[in-house]
Every structure is written in C-alpha cells, then in structure tokens.
C-alpha cells in the first residue's frame, strides 16, 4: 500500500485555527459502514445515533503546557517541546535551536527556570530541571498547539485544547474528538442510557510526524503510554452481554482498546504501544467511532480507512471538503459505524 494513496486536496481556508464559541457547535458528517451512506448533521445530533446500552469509551488524558522557550547559556534561543515526563525533575523533549545543546549545557527558561541537557536519545533530549517539572510547566509553559494551527497559543487554549473530562496529566496533544463534548452533552448521553468508560493514552508529539516512507508497511509508529483498566474490560464485556455497541471517542481510544486486545481478547493493559492500524488489520473491540478530520497521508487517516473502508473514507473526505467542513484539531467531526468488509486502496483500482 502506498502512502500517496491517502492524499487529498485541502484548501488552507478549511483548517480550523480557532475553536467555535461552543464545543458542541461543530458539524457532524455521519458515515454508515454497511451502506456507505453519508449524512450532514450537527454534532448534537450524535444523540440520535446512540442507543440505550451502548458504551462510549473516552480518553481522559490531560494536556500539559508542554512548550517552553528559552536560551542556552551561550545566548542562542531555543524551543523545547516536552514529549514525556520521566519523573518529577526529568523529561524527554524535542529541542529546536540553531545548534543542538550538548550534555552538561545549561538552558535558561523564559519566565524563570533552569534546565540541564543530560543526554541525547536519537531525536529526543533528556533534560533535568532544578525545580519540579509539572509546576514549572504550569507556570511558564505554553499549550502545544499542532503545527498546522500556526499561531501563538492564547489563554483560552488552556481550556479549549482540553476535554471537559481530562484528568490524568501526560499528553502533549489533545485527543481532539473529545473536544466536542461539553458537560450538558455528557449528561444527555447518560440520560439516554448510554454507558461511559475511560481509558488513558498520553498523546505524543509523534502524532503530528509525517509518514516518511513510500510503502505503509515500512512505517514504524512512535510509542505512546496507555492504560486500559479492569473497569473498562468489565464495561466492554457488559456491553457485549446486553447487545450494545462499543463506541470509541477518538482514534486514541481505538488504539488503546485494540492495543489491549491484540490477541483478540480484551485484557487490562498498562504500558507503551506502537500499534499501527491501517487497511487490512482487523478490529477486535470497536464498533463505531467519533473522530475529527485528519491530515492527508497521516496514520490517523489510515486508521479511519481501515475502520470504514478506503473508498468510503476518501469519498467522505471529498464530501467534507466540498461542503466546507472544518478540518483537524479544532475542526468538525465524523460518526462512523464499522464496515464489516472494508476494502483497501489496492482493492479499489
């Protein structure tokens, strides 16, 4: 399978650079996995597609203000994007500067604070901070908006680039399908008899990295930490028992559930995953998906194509572009039911 199969034309004007006034004010494109039928709706219409007894699985990771600005002791400016917090004083981070800092060199953080470059691990730098990392980030860090938003973060992003149910600190990118849900909608979902469960996957900056190979099969996914608890396993089993559907909110919830069911049976799991879901890979847990619109040639678009079928997904994206849907993190959403016999690009030529 070629990465180029997953490209599409996207006008720059359709990239959402700010959130709408209301979280649930987005549009919703629905895709029926059996018939391939599309429907243009509002996000609040999602309730009409839910059934009593369904289970919605959310990712409760919380985005940390992971971007720091500073300078080396020599005076050169640099930018730090924390990828993973290792302990109270150490992180793994991406560092952008004219020259990479060397082990032992000091970094002065804008707003107050100091770090030391401890070691380099391939593309990542291990940094040690004089004070505790999380309070420092909360005090002087910036929200790590994706590169395609291409604007400085604003005070409102601390709230809006965060789900209302965010709980466990550790992500450097939001699980964006969840940004559409406000407390009122969450209560309406519960009132309809739909159960909820929460996994944790700390989204890393690697989610924005382009696929740099020509053949999908040659791509190696970045790793991210996740946790699927016994409570989630029990909730999925109870959902199956009553004939409900497991509805993943976001691709990170899909990757969490499917990582914990690699042998076909869902089990509690805590640790790193590098699961790469693309056309041809079976799904063991998820029956329906709420997701945003993703970048061309991205692993997330490949995941959606594996779930809904390649021709159906690309047709849906063309319809979204033609109808002026807003794309990416602050954009609109899709509700997709799983295609029981999804085709890949090579089967549609």
Swiss-Prot record:
Its EC number is 2.4.99.17. This is S-adenosylmethionine:tRNA ribosyltransferase-isomerase. The gene is queA. Belongs to the QueA family. GO terms for molecular function: S-adenosylmethionine:tRNA ribosyltransferase-isomerase activity. It comes from Pseudomonas fluorescens (strain Pf0-1). The keyword Glycoprotein does not apply. Transfers and isomerizes the ribose moiety from AdoMet to the 7-aminomethyl group of 7-deazaguanine (preQ1-tRNA) to give epoxyqueuosine (oQ-tRNA). GO terms for biological process: queuosine biosynthetic process; tRNA wobble guanine modification.
